[in-house]
């Protein structure tokens, strides 16, 4: 862990370059560029709001904000972990030529997704202002669920990037997994409609309490539940440490599979 931190400080300028490169590549040859980070969640919010507000009569105040806040959280996790999955073999040519701490490639993918998260968060704020939703002081607590989400995603990304170097089929399986995971995360539906057994299943999803905390401070104007926060912190730290361990144990074999 000590060497990881030392390398992180030493190679910080390189990390910044990698993040900038990842963002540029993502929006290369796009007329609107990074603006799509604002527009995508807004378009999806409109579509989902129209569809689900007519199909299902959910008793949710300002359903558009409810959906958009769910998208902000889930899309970051899905995008960050998916991008992190290809971080190692996607940089094979560089890894083979020079020594670079390999975890930096994973961190850069997650950090570039974090920039998208900030843009999506801006879109959420704009919608709140446009709909005259109340902005309470609890919005100042938003960094708490955001930091937990980023660290948790980094832990998952480290595991996925290490495993995918050897087993590329993971990429296809993970697409199916994230689709299923979205329906096990209260992105488009309120928790109140779930029967008892399904409620417990959805609460086992680590993203659920993070999303609930995010919504509480952003649109519900309520404080974060301390017991929920403590459990989420433990889960996040555990996932991050697991990610570091798996990555560290496998990184010396990466070159053999690139």
Label the predicted regions.
Residues 1-258:
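Hydrophobic transmembrane alpha-helices and immediately adjacent juxtamembrane helices
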């Amino acid at each position: 862990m000590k060497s990881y931190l030392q390398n992180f400080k030493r190679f910080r300028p390189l990390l910044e370059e990698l993040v900038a490169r990842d963002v540029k590549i993502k929006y290369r040859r796009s007329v609107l560029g990074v603006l799509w980070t604002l527009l995508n969640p807004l378009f999806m919010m409109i579509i989902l709001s129209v569809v689900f507000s007519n199909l299902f009569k959910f008793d949710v105040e300002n359903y558009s904000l409810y959906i958009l806040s769910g998208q902000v959280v889930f899309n970051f996790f899905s995008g960050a972990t998916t991008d992190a999955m290809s971080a190692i073999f996607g940089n094979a040519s560089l890894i083979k030529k020079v020594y670079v701490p390999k975890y930096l490639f994973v961190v850069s993918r997650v950090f570039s997704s974090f920039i998208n998260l900030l843009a999506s968060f801006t879109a959420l704020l704009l919608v709140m202002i446009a709909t005259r939703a109340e902005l309470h002081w609890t919005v100042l607590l938003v960094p708490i669920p955001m930091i937990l989400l980023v660290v948790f995603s980094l832990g998952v990304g480290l595991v996925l990037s290490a495993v995918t170097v050897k087993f590329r089929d993971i990429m296809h399986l993970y697409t199916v997994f994230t689709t299923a995971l979205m329906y096990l995360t209260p992105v488009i539906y309120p928790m109140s409609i779930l029967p008892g057994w399904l409620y417990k299943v959805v609460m086992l999803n680590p993203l659920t309490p993070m999303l609930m905390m995010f919504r509480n401070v952003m649109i519900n104007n309520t404080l974060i539940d301390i017991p929920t926060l403590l459990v989420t912190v433990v889960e996040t730290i555990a996932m991050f440490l697991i990610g570091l361990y798996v990555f560290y144990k496998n990184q010396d074999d990466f070159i053999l599979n690139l």
